[in-house]
């Protein structure tokens, strides 16, 4: 397997360097400048498209081919070792490979920051959340970090009056998958243009006509895989809703990870975990999982899926502690990029900070530092977008509830057409034409 990862790394490096060579060629720069000189004659979407082309070119110019090639190979190796380390529940198995990725990412951040006139971490952040910098995030995250503990404690106190009954039993992955597929279809995922598979960590990849959603099933927890699959369905619906007339153009792509995450979190946290959706889902749950008794009633399922609880796993977190999970990762990755934290010490740093942020210490590396693959594949400055995405999701949801009549009734009936149309019109169909701030303001007032 390790040999295959090296081969895959070579292939990815070849593709990355070829794309880089095309973007940084003098011909592309000449064409961009020629188009810029004629900007007065361009339509609005073409001006936005040119802006995105220039942005891609500028980011590419900062990177030498050799660094791109080394990073592609390093992340391919680290990803394979991460999967093995997670299975073995032993961070030491991936630590040296992650250290290589971190070192190369530091070099990349420094070069990118120098070229763009940004702090190294801000330069990485700008890739995932264009226009959003730490100067704006730090006060927001500081406020969240200060207020979250009391909000969590208040919720825990309120829950004590009516704690949810646990779901007991074991549920075959095939039955869980069937439930996921039926729910995804109802929400609008087209299985003639995509599919659902299993993986160590859930993700969504692909293009508009071929979207791949994955999830991970736990036999003792039938809602673990379901919530992950429907979270990823939010990502997929966003990709499907991007403007078809601008397909394959930079302006027709995602506006950034914060907006993408807002769509997955809106679907999972606001729609799927709601009482109306669980009312709609209940017959499917009965059909595929076969549960019976008070624990399987809608009221209990609602309390179960909305309860605030300390979990070491981000993917199992509720809407309050999810933000604490994200802040933990933001703290650690900034230390990694700045050089204040060595990759070799990451596991202990994670466990110690988890006690502060989450009030719980992971029992193993698998439920601690190894639960996400993002850093192994080089995705640094990715997690701040999760926090922003959660906040954007709440803003959009409030606007939707104000504008869509009988939203709860429609969801309970399994009618998601009006909801999906609102999102396509106000979010998905905008593509990268507007920046995130302008898009959210236009959508919410």
Where are these regions (language model features)?
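A well-structured
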Residues: 1-130, 433-435
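Secondary-structure capping and boundary motifs in well-ordered enzyme cores
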Residues: 7, 67-70, 97-100, 140, ...
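C-terminal, non-catalytic "cap/extension" segments appended to globular domains
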Residues: 7, 326, 330-444
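Contiguous, non-catalytic segments that form substrate-binding/exosite surfaces or channel walls
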Residues: 66, 71-222
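Active-site recognition of the HExxH zinc-binding catalytic motif
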Residues: 113, 217, 221-244, 261-268, ...
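Acidic/polar loop patches that form or flank catalytic/metal-binding clefts of enzymes
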Residues: 192-193, 245-249, 273-283, 343-344
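Post-HExxH zinc-binding segment in Zn-dependent metallohydrolases
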Residues: 253-294
């Amino acid at each position: 397997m390790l040999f295959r990862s090296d081969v895959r790394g070579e292939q990815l490096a070849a593709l990355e360097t070829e794309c880089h060579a095309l973007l940084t060629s003098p011909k592309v720069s000449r064409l961009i400048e020629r188009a810029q000189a004629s900007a007065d004659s361009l339509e609005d979407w073409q001006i936005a498209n040119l802006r995105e082309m220039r942005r891609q070119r500028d980011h590419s110019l900062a990177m030498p081919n050799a660094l791109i090639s080394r990073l592609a190979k390093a992340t391919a190796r680290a990803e394979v070792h991460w999967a093995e380390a997670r299975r073995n529940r032993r961070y030491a198995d991936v630590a040296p490979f992650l250290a290589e990725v971190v070192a190369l990412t530091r070099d990349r951040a420094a070069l990118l920051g120098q070229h763009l006139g940004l702090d190294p971490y801000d330069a990485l952040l700008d890739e995932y959340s264009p226009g959003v910098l730490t100067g704006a995030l730090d006060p927001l995250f500081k406020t969240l970090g200060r207020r979250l503990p009391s909000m969590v404690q208040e919720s825990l106190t309120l829950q004590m009056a009516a704690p949810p009954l646990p779901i007991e039993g074991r549920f075959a992955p095939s039955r869980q998958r069937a439930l996921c597929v039926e729910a995804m279809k109802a929400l609008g995922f087209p299985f003639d243009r995509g599919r659902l598979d299993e993986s160590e960590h859930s993700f969504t990849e692909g293009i508009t006509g071929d979207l791949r959603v994955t999830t991970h099933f736990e036999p003792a927890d039938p809602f673990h895989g379901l919530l992950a699959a429907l979270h990823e369905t939010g990502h997929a619906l966003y990709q499907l809703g991007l403007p078809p007339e601008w397909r394959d153009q930079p302006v027709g792509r995602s506006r950034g990870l914060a907006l993408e995450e807002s769509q997955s979190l809106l679907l999972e946290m606001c729609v799927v975990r709601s009482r109306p959706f669980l009312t709609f889902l209940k017959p499917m749950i009965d059909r595929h999982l076969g549960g019976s008794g008070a624990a399987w009633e809608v009221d209990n399922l609602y309390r179960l899926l909305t309860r605030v609880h300390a979990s070491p796993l981000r993917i199992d977190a509720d809407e309050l502690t999810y933000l604490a999970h994200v802040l933990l990762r933001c703290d650690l990755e900034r230390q990694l990029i700045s050089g204040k934290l060595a990759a070799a010490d990451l596991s202990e740093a994670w466990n110690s900070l988890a006690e502060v942020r989450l009030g719980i210490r992971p029992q193993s590396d698998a439920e601690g530092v190894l639960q996400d693959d993002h850093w192994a594949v080089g995705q640094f400055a990715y997690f701040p977008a999760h926090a922003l995405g959660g906040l954007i999701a709440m803003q959009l949801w409030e606007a939707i509830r104000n504008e869509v009549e009988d939203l709860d009734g429609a969801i309970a009936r399994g009618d998601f057409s009006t909801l999906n149309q609102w999102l396509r019109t106000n979010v998905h169909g905008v593509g990268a034409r507007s920046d995130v701030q302008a898009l959210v303001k236009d959508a919410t007032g």
